[in-house]
Amino acid sequence: MPTHTCPTCLKEFAQKGHLTAHLNRKKKCEPSALVIRLTSLEAEVKELRNVVVLPTEVTPMTAISLFSGAGGDTLGLERAGIKVVAFNEFNEAATKTHTTVFPSSVNIVHPETKDSNIRNVPDSAFESYKNKVQLIMAGFPCQGMSHAGKKRVDDKRNELVHEFVRVTKIVQPEWIIGENVKGLLSRKGRLNPEAPLRPVIEIIRDLFDSIGYRITYQVIDVSTIGVPQNRKRLIIIGHRGTTYPHVPWNSLTDASTPPTTSIRSFLEPHLDDAMELPALYKPQDQPSHYWIPTTETAVKGTPHKNLDRLTRGLRNRSSAEKVADPTGPDQLIEPEGLISFGVRKGGYYGMVVNPDVPCNTIISTYNLCPRLFVGLYNPTIRKYWIRCMTSKELGQIQGFPATYQWQGTEKEKIIQIGNAVPPPLAERIGRTILAGRVELKEEAQGLEATEAVTGATGATVDDDDDE
């Protein structure tokens, strides 16, 4: 049987009419102890709400990307939780890709001419971001840095690193991240013709020091952080102020799952622009892991001219050979061919990649002179082919998703991929900074720049600027 309860004294009645009579009587009932306690608690909660500031939505860290390319650093930073509100990129195809994938990120250009060459973008275009952006990341080119005075080292605008410094000085972010080839550590330069040659990294350190930023740097092999490619890159991390950032470089490789070391899942079993491998290479004697199984039986399209040349064993004569025989032919035939497996035997050679280990470094000139090839085998008809990698495959080897919306021609896409910052690299660095794991100390971290992590084994690692 349902009961009816007085909200004051909590006395129960079998009939609703009895409760009504109880509530309407002249002598009101006394509140029960439980009601008194609940009333007191409600008052306390109300009072606390007046003095306690409840947390509001956290404003995400924001960033600007310079020399952005197709957006590898932007993708990585945004995956880490850092919003890239603006970027600067000069290349038209790369700009289209970045704008397509990140439509809310603004390309900072000259306000009147719309020139996106950072050298021509005035200070005023960056001033609106002053003290509003917490991070700048720049995969800055440094190919123009003088060596032995062969270039106009007195022209500071000749070095794009100066643009990185200029924008940093204007915007005043808390953090800066720079990315470059590891070979930068071995280069020397100078800021003016009278100055002695010294390591470029020291010049960069002093440039940032002069505007109030302290830096540390390290070489990272991206194969240790989820990118299936032996690609070693110099990473510079700086902080505004007088204290030095101490980065837990080894922890960049910390992950709940092991990094991807195989490229097999990225390689597609088609014969587009492929070339049948001649018998002289004895493909049937090569280990089976070099071959991607295919059911296709006929080549579609035209093989790249460099693939055709290498497969036929045709190479240019060296300078020494020309001196020895000035009347000889411009090109020579290597009777054993110029295709090797797993390891490039020399500068002339092309290589069939091992799909089960990290790939050699992908460079922006791959489409011009490819030397890394995919091997394919049809077991039914027992034929072997090799072909160049596609932009879709190369993009995934660089750490981009297969669905990334690359814009431009196939050549333009490959240039963008070769120049890109691998997204997982930018993501790991961004997460490390956001998590507060970069300590600030009075002394420098130690700028020996030995490699923080070593690459996975199995494939040769060529120079930064080559496959």
Q: How would you name each of these model-derived features?
A:
Residues 129, 222-224, 347-350:
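Short, P/G- and charge-enriched loop/turn segments at secondary-structure junctions
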Residues 1-36:
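C-terminal recognition-helix end and immediately following basic linker
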Residues 213-224:
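Conserved S-adenosyl-L-methionine
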Residues 54-85, 207-210, 233-467:
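S-adenosyl-L-methionine-dependent DNA methyltransferase catalytic core
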Residues 188-211, 230-235, 239:
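Short, electropositive alpha-helical surface patch
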Residues 171-174, 213, 232:
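A short helix->loop->beta-strand "cap" motif at the edges of active sites that frequently abuts
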Residues 54-175, 181-202:
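Core alpha/beta nucleotide-donor-binding catalytic domains of modification enzymes
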Residues 34-51:
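Amphipathic alpha-helical oligomerization/assembly segments
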